[in-house]
Amino acid sequence: MLCRAYGKINLSLDINGVREDGYHTLESIFLPIDFYDLVDIEKADEMSFSSNKYYIRYNESNTIRKAIELMKNEFNIKDNFKIDLKKYIPTQAGLAGGSADGSATIKALNHLYDLNLSKDKIQELCMKIGSDVLFTYYHKPALVSGIGEKIEFIDVKKDYYVLLIKPKYGVSTKECYSLMNLDTCVHPDIHKLKEVLENGEDFISYLGNSMEDAAISLVPEIADAKKDLLDSGAPFALMSGSGSTVFTMSEDEELIKNIYKKLENKNYFLRYAKVLKNKRNW
């Protein structure tokens, strides 16, 4: 079973608290994009894992492995699997590639074994793997809050095109959180942003990312990427998630393509994408 594992951008991210268990709480507009990994899972006599990227290991931190082991335990699945991951979304990028791989695995096994998982069970399983996994299961525009378990789908009025620009180095989410100061970081108005997106109005004045300053202290090249985007004519430049990817977005597809051309000879990972507005399961 071949599944697409769609990435996302955070069109503003507000880290607004820390729970007693140490988890940070957030409010954010998550937008899925048509940039994805491919997860192929088949029943097999023995467990095997392969990937087109040499650095991807089938270890305890691998979200596909987490999902496989979780599903086997939850539903008494005895089979082994042949797993192949075509990895295109960069790691430590703030694009939820690993989370999407985990949710794609849950989808695949849900289909292979006709489990007919309820929404509550899907939420339970996804949250056991990671905070962005539930959103990537549905990959539909949403206001996400709590620690990722609260999802309110939104109707984005216009079509948008995105340019992703990632420096060479990634950001450790754990390290980034440890450097944050919730009293001094930016706290964008996520609910106002939701409102203007649903009305098709200008959203740029409502953008912000609470984690950006901390991430730049770890990877200063993020600031360079933002400057290069703006110098190339981007309407704005914002970091996604905990970084290190920076992006811009516009309803003007030609503008995004022209910015891509201006930056394609620089030492960045570049990707043009479109925001997904409708639910896609596979």
Task: Identify what each model region corresponds to.
Residues A93-E124, F135:
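DPxDG-like acidic metal-binding loop motif
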Residues G97-G98, M239-S244:
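Glycine-rich beta-strand-to-loop/alpha-helix junction loops that act as flexible
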Residues M1-A93, H111, L115-D120, V156, ...:
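ATP-binding N-lobe of GHMP and related small-molecule kinases
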Residues F247-M249:
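Short hydrophobic/aromatic beta-strand micro-patches
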Residues F49, Y138, L143-F236, E251-E264, ...:
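Conserved, helical-rich catalytic subdomain that frames metal- and/or nucleotide-binding sites
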Residues S118-I129, K257-K261:
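Short, well-structured alpha-helical segments that form the helix of a local strand-helix-strand
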